[in-house]
Regions:
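Glycine-rich beta-alpha junction loops
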Residues: 23-30, 114-116, 168, 193-194
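Short acidic, glycine/serine/threonine-rich loops at helix termini
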Residues: 4-6, 30-37, 41, 173-175, ...
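Redox- and metal-dependent alpha/beta enzyme cores, enriched for Fe-S-associated oxidoreductases
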Residues: 100-132, 137, 143-149
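Conformationally flexible catalytic loops at phosphate/diphosphate-handling active centers
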Residues: 16-100
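Peripheral docking tails and interdomain loops at the edges
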Residues: 164-211
């Protein structure tokens, strides 16, 4: 979470586009030791400021150069369409990110985002210690969604995917279905309304899914 928050500012400045940090309530309240990225030098900070001098409203001599403007759209429809195509190319350039574990021999793949991703990772490591052939996909970006990671699974071996979410009804399961395209069953392990997911629940659901598939 710390690394992604740090990177969000770079992405926002690079593309002049808002970046949403989708932290959940648990991630926003826990305390734990973290390792911060290296501090940038004064020269690096000056270079970053200089990059945005031509377009940002920095408060000094901004009247001397045209600044970025925001409007509802363009009256010329062809120009608006060109702008939309340019934006599409920008969106395609954004990398998707996901943490993966033990996918080389997994028969059941557990997935979760936010705090559920961390809980799922802990459960998967315990299950592996018990001899279960289980893997993990933990999406770090939800847009773009790491569809290629799900689509690239070996569906001859993978019997099912278990989606862990603190959300009822599940939301990310729809993105998973689009990536998997009915090549294996997708089960859910859900909580909502303030109920916190536990790793023992995830372990129990994984065992159930593994037996049924």
């Amino acid at each position: 979470a710390v690394d992604m928050t740090y990177a969000a500012f770079d992405y926002a400045q690079q593309d002049r586009n808002p970046v949403l940090i989708l932290s959940d309530g648990v991630m926003g309240t826990i305390m734990e030791p973290v390792e911060l990225p290296p501090e940038r030098s004064a020269e690096e900070v000056r270079a970053l400021k200089e990059q945005c001098r031509s377009w940002a409203a920095i408060g000094h001599d901004s009247y001397k150069e045209p600044r970025a403007t925001i409007d509802a759209g363009r009256w010329d429809t062809k120009e608006q369409e060109r702008h939309c195509k340019k934006a599409e190319e920008l969106y395609k350039s954004w990398p998707s990110e996901a943490e993966t574990l033990y996918l080389d021999d997994a028969e059941v793949v557990v997935t979760g985002y936010g705090i559920c991703g961390r809980i799922a990772r802990s459960a998967v490591k315990l299950l592996r210690a018990e001899g279960c052939k289980v893997g993990l996909i933990r999406p770090k970006t939800l847009y773009p969604f790491p569809s290629d990671v799900f689509a690239g699974l070996d569906f001859v071996r993978v019997k099912a995917i278990l989606d862990v979410e603190m959300c009822i009804p599940a939301q990310v399961v729809d993105d998973i279905r689009l990536a998997v395209t009915d090549r294996c069953p997708i089960e859910t392990c859900l909580h909502a309304g303030g109920e916190i997911m536990g790793r023992d629940e995830v372990r129990s659901e994984e065992r159930r899914v593994g037996k049924e598939c």
